[in-house]
Amino acid sequence: RLVLRAGIKDKSINWVCVNDVTDAKTLAHLFKYDSVHGKYNGTVEHTDDSLVIDGRKIKVLSVLEPTKLPWKDMKIDVVVESTGKFTDRESVQQHLNAGAKKVLISAPAKNPDITIVMGVNDKMYDKKKHHIVSNASCTTNCLAPVVKVLHDNFGVKRGFMTTIHAYTADKSLL
């Protein structure tokens, strides 16, 4: 939802589809009333199978297996894979096999074509050879830009950091 929320005002992006385990009505409510980012300042409506945000209709699917997604028929250029479930090359390849041209993984990934942290190494991206792109971890996205500034201005030979992370489904409490 946050990727869509951050980019919905950009008219150069054609938002085609959202694939989620929940229905369009619930997605519309969650988009409109975000508990962290507040109420969306625009119109959010839904049909049985679509979101309509500021008049832009976005198809809603609920397909669990990426190989069964209609990316080819929908002419999808980029899939934002943010389920946390598909983070290795083999599983993400399913999106490409279904017809997507590129996959951006919103998490650390095993064997992506490249891992990009915006403002740090994004100039290394080559659209001709990088089709599976990882956006690294939330920790990396917080730390790397700061370290880059320190390194560029003062030089960093070694570093150490500690992170305190909120509980997530892949963490063990005990």
Task: Describe each PLM feature range.
Residues 1-173:
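N-terminal Rossmann-like NAD(P) cofactor-binding subdomain of oxidoreductases
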